[in-house]
Amino acid sequence: MTLTIVVGLGRSGLGAARLLHHQGQKVVVLERGTGPDQTSCAATLQAEGIQVELGIPLEINSFEPWRSDLDAVVVGPGIPWDHPTLNGLRQEGVQIRGEIELAWEALNDIPWVGITGTNGKTTVTHLLSHVLGHAGIVAPMGGNMGVSAADMALKIRRGETPKPDWLVMELSSYQIEAGPNLAPSIGIWTTLTPDHLERHGTLEAYRAIKHSLLQRSSLAIFNGDDADLSAHRPSLKRGMWVKAAPPCHDDPPADFWIDDAGTVQAREGGAMFPAKVLAMPGAHNRQNLLLVTAAAAQIGLNAEQIAQGLESFPGVPHRLENLGSTSSADVFNDSKATNYDAAAVGLQAMAGPVVVLAGGQTKRGNATGWLAELKSKACAVVLFGAGAEELDALIRQSNYQGQVHRCTDLSAAVAIAVRATSELQASSLLLSPACASFDQYQDFEARGDHFRDLMQPHMHVG
């Protein structure tokens, strides 16, 4: 029997190993770590009949004991698709596969909505899944957040969850790169700004990966308010376009937009419902509303069903999540803002003046827009984590006139921010890191959860 090796015991690796085992394939999992978490995961898989080897680095020699039977190696999105070891295995004729492609093969009898973009994809994923579910369509979400695609496939194929009508999948550039055959029924592209350049090298390479998903989608939906997508519209696949503002005379046509009276309009069908049915703040959420409306309409929902779903949406954890108020300011958790552009968009939605907590593991990118929003809205910035010194220098060079504080971690940052909010009579206190979380946290969710816990003693009750 041929063998598939799964690399890594992360969320994707666990799902992939279990799915392959369920399909009757011989599987071995290789994991470089040897800590308590890895040991616990390994014991669980071994009890299920899956072989796990710990302390095995991703090197070509690590595969030697299984070379005679090795047919394929499966990797999750955390491993670069062009890793030298993977390239070496390719040259030897070994298939290199992404976890997302295993899930696609197992679930391509169900229509997919594939949602990608630098920012906005998590909100659109949550919102579309909710709107469809509210209308009685079984449309679970997963992929780049929540349940891994392979784990979702396993639960469906085992009959542990009902077979969905649709799958609403958030797809990162890493997953798209590793899923060249993934072809959703509907593809949605929310935004494109420089991100993950440490991995992809250039903006052009990053854009091409995102574009490939939309090219393979039966229907493509684009955000016409995004500067990069709009500039590249002539080269993009024909599809549907949404714009939050009414199209001007010289603008390319839009399929959905919001008119001057605040009503969502459809090119085919006319007035639908007031945009204010979605309570989430910010111009970017009007774009998200339109992308979801376009997809839901294609799936078969009418205007009333879409409006009811939007109106009942509770929001997305860690994305401008309103935690309540201190005695003087509204508190928002925007831990999902892991780059400058996402952080700038969050700031735009805030009532100023704002005390901002920022920091973590910095990324390559253009900080100009973020710095402009800080200068416009923020009365104080509290920096924490590994990137605090770098961000401090960036902010001071921008001639920012507000207070700048620097500390080691989020706990210290919250104490400073709460004090500054009171002293400066700020209207809002916002965690908006503009950085990845991996310097001090497992992921942005853990960072946001910690912020929520740290803020709890300071929140106003009653």
From Swiss-Prot:
Pfam families: Mur_ligase_C, Mur_ligase_M, MurD-like_N. InterPro entries: Mur-like_cat_sf, Mur_ligase_C, Mur_ligase_C_dom_sf, Mur_ligase_cen, MurD. The keyword Acyltransferase does not apply. One of its GO terms (molecular function) is ATP binding. Keywords: ATP-binding, Cell cycle, Cell division, Cell shape, Cell wall biogenesis/degradation, Cytoplasm, Ligase, Nucleotide-binding, Peptidoglycan synthesis. Gene3D superfamilies: Mur ligase, C-terminal domain, Mur-like, catalytic domain, NAD(P)-binding Rossmann-like Domain. One of its GO terms (cellular component) is cytoplasm. GO terms for biological process: cell division; cell wall organization; peptidoglycan biosynthetic process; regulation of cell shape. ATP binds at residues 117-123. It catalyses: UDP-N-acetyl-alpha-D-muramoyl-L-alanine + D-glutamate + ATP = UDP-N-acetyl-alpha-D-muramoyl-L-alanyl-D-glutamate + ADP + phosphate + H(+). It is found in: Cytoplasm. Pathway: Cell wall biogenesis; peptidoglycan biosynthesis. Its EC number is 6.3.2.9. It comes from the Bacteria. Its main location: cytoplasm. NCBIfam families: murD. Cell wall formation. Catalyzes the addition of glutamate to the nucleotide precursor UDP-N-acetylmuramoyl-L-alanine (UMA). Belongs to the MurCDEF family. This is UDP-N-acetylmuramoylalanine--D-glutamate ligase. The lineage of its organism: Bacteria, Bacillati, Cyanobacteriota, Cyanophyceae, Synechococcales. The gene is murD.
